[in-house]
Amino acid sequence: MFGFMTMNQTPIRLEDLLENVDKPLPDITRPVWRFHDNFNDLLDFWLRRHGTFRALLSDLSAAVEDFGADGPDVAEEERLMEMWSLFREQLAQHQQVEDGVYFPVVVALHPEFESAFDALFEDHGAIDACLDAVENAEDGAGMMEALLLLNDKLLGHMEAEEDLIMPLVLETPPPLEFVVYDEDGNEVGGDDVLEDEDEDDSLTYVTKN
């Protein structure tokens, strides 16, 4: 059923991202991220977004597993579809911001790691294939199998992504920040506007660094 995903369904690891990178990552490990002098609201927001996707995936898996346990239920099916639509839409928008805003900024600051970000970009495409497999599943069992693949793929991706990006950004003084402009070139805010990162396609994000 999932033959078209075989090549990319393996969760990516930090070691995979760094395969063609000669420069070592800064030695800033996960336990100290939030205590680092350069940790700021933007980084907190980005990590919390990943936390939201982890929670949504868990809720979706539980909902699919329980679906139909007490017989057909139209309301239950509608709730499940709403959960899935919300998850897929928010994830797609989040990845667009990463690919179009976050990643280019970090690559510009650390060009030695460009190949690692190319791998992350490609892995976003592999995640899309996993999402399609969930939607194209023929029955509940197939959907659950596809969700498990998606779960492993996305969790691995976010962990590797965080372990790559956080040390690079935390090493970058001053703390990484963004100025946000509307389509007329007017400054409309800073990192706080990223709370609504997916609300308005007309906004332009420019790093202060």
Model feature map: region roles:
Residues 1-209:
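Small-residue-biased structural context
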